[in-house]
Amino acid sequence: PGTCNPSNVETALEFGLDVVKFFPAEPAGGLKYIKAIAAPYTGVCFMPTGGINAENVKEYLKYDRIIACGGSWMVKGDLIKSGNFEKIKELTAEAAAIVKEIRG
């Protein structure tokens, strides 16, 4: 669960939160929608999950109101079940490199 509309952001603010999980990011409209929601909430940062992957995570991370991204592409269930931890290590290292490239 997470925020996916302005009413949810308002509720988070009522609880004193300034960082909210935004879910499901891509099905809800992606970065364009997050930017539209974020505009009036200048003190709120977002952590999108849901549809984030190696192909689109860079664009999310370039937006200064994104504090972090979640993505299951790095640790898929089939990789865990098959014990393919080397692939998980490779994918998480790639994700960390993307973060370092964008955020320093």
Please name every model-derived segment.
Residues 1-6, 26-28, 48-54:
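Glycine-rich beta-to-alpha transition loops that act as phosphate-gripper elements at the mouths
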Residues 7-15, 38, 52-68:
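Catalytic cores of alpha/beta
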Residues 9, 21-30, 65-87:
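Glycine-rich phosphate-binding active-site loops on the catalytic face of alpha/beta enzymes
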Residues 20, 60, 95:
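Conserved, mostly hydrophobic/aromatic
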Residues 78-104:
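C-terminal helical cap(s) of enzyme catalytic domains, especially alpha/beta-barrels
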Residues 1-3, 8-24:
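Active-site beta->alpha loop and helix N-cap motifs at the rims of alpha/beta catalytic domains
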Residues 18-19, 43-47, 67-68:
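Structural preference for beta-strand elements that scaffold enzyme active sites
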